[in-house]
Regions:
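Conserved RecA-like P-loop NTPase ATPase core
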Residues: 3, 97, 164, 214, ...
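Walker A/P-loop nucleotide-binding motif
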Residues: 104-123, 206
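AAA+/P-loop NTPase substrate/partner-engagement loops
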Residues: 127-172
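A short helix-turn-beta junction within AAA+ P-loop NTPase domains corresponding to the substrate/partner-engaging
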Residues: 149, 219-220, 250-304
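Conserved catalytic/switch belt of AAA+ P-loop NTPases
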Residues: 129, 169-193, 197-243, 265-266
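Short glycine-/polar-rich loops that comprise or flank the Walker A/P-loop
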Residues: 104-105, 146-150, 196-197, 221-222, ...
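Alpha-helical lid/collar subdomain of P-loop NTPases
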Residues: 1-107, 114, 275-372
Length: 372
């Protein structure tokens, strides 16, 4: 999508950059804005082509480095508290999500299961709330951007359209708010006495059955139109976030109205794995950066006899590095036809964690009994 909505988003991003960095030259401002809007929605293999096109359009123009040190430190603190390893690729996705939220009131986070979609926006929420709590510190905070954030999560496919948007009772003809209309009404009303950001997250498949009624919310009207004839306005601190696996059933009209952040699990895979066109799922975990953080986070939850023993932790990680790649290749190649349900490589790693944890706990219990 490179229509007028995309152009307007680039102009909004450029305006924000101009106000934040008035000394930045115009070419660098436009280049940074274009990258902020377009880079998050590309696959890892498409970024090289995109970078080449941008390099031809902006000759001898360098993109200035953005100072996000305050937000990065807050994200690292949140990651430490939530037992999340802040891999550079994942940290970059969080920053991309934050930039997208500032220029688009509707956005989609697309990715496979366990690719970090939920963790991405929850960590950003906690980091922004943490920065907001530190307003008394001598920090260069933008009160419009670093605000305490409230999140409301809805599964749109778990309820009917009437329960989602609201309905008129057939007998009494009285209007009853649905889940979305009730949350939307409360979030819009809070704007008059609260500056907290409100994110309404739709965690589920995106299809034309329920999302077409959101078109007036996602475009410049920013109003939720109910079947009762009521129109609920959206405040400037509200965002509609769609967390979904893919956009196969979404219409182009809906996609063009939203910003896009693609959480690609193969972001950390090797070029050799990405070049395997016969079986895209094969070798998806050859690069350790894609799955070792999951193992280290799991080891942090183990008893102190393991988590506080760095030698034992590194030994277990080395065993995983030796065993996981061939096991994943075996499951995705030779045993693929035996799987009742397809599983991603990260899901297989989590399954190994659970089974290995059971073995270790049995061993520790017997060892403790012998010591007693």
């Amino acid at each position: 999508d490179y229509g007028m909505r995309a152009v307007k988003s680039v102009l909004d991003a450029a305006g924000n950059l101009r106000r934040k960095h008035p000394d930045m030259n115009e070419a660098s401002t436009v280049l940074t804005a274009v990258n902020q809007i377009n880079r998050p929605k590309f696959l890892i293999d498409d970024l090289a082509l995109y970078s080449g096109i941008i390099g031809d359009l902006f000759l001898n123009v360098e993109e200035p480095v953005q100072d996000n040190s305050l937000l990065v430190r807050a994200i690292e603190e949140v990651g430490l508290a939530q037992n999340v390893h802040n891999h550079p690729a994942f940290l970059n996705k969080i920053l991309e999500l934050r930039e997208m939220i500032l220029v688009r009131h509707g956005l989609m986070i697309v990715g496979d299961p366990l690719s970090g979609k939920t963790c991405c926006y929850t960590m950003l929420q906690e980091a922004l709330s943490l920065l907001n709590a530190r307003k008394e510190l001598p920090c260069d905070l933008n009160p419009k951007h670093e605000l305490k954030t409230d999140v409301f999560v809805i599964n749109p496919k778990s309820i009917s359209m009437g329960d989602l948007y609201g309905y008129n009772d057939l007998v009494s003809q009285e209007w009853s708010d649905g889940v979305l209309s009730k949350i939307y009404r409360a979030a819009s009303a809070c704007a008059s006495h609260s500056d907290n950001r409100k994110w309404i997250v739709f965690d589920g498949p995106v299809d034309a059955v329920w999302i077409e009624n959101m078109n007036t919310v996602l475009d410049d009207n920013r109003k939720l139109c109910l079947v009762s004839g009521e129109m609920l306005p959206m405040s400037q601190y509200m965002n509609m976030v769609f967390e979904t696996l893919n956009l196969d059933q979404a219409s182009p009209a809906t996609v063009s109205r939203c910003g896009m952040v693609y959480m690609s699990a193969p972001d950390c895979t090797t070029s050799a794995a990405r070049g395997n066109t016969e079986n895209p799922g094969n070798n998806a975990l050859l690069n350790e950066a894609a799955w070792v953080p999951h193992v280290r986070a799991w080891l942090n939850t183990m008893p102190a006899v393991v988590s506080r023993n760095p030698v034992l932790v590194e030994t277990i990680v080395l065993l995983y590095k030796w065993a996981i790649p061939p096991l994943v290749n075996l499951m995705t190649d030779e045993l693929k036809s035996c799987q009742m349900l397809p599983a991603s490589g990260i899901a297989m790693v989590h399954a190994v964690n659970r089974m290995f944890g059971c073995v270790l706990q049995t061993h520790w219990a017997s060892a403790a009994a012998e010591e007693e």
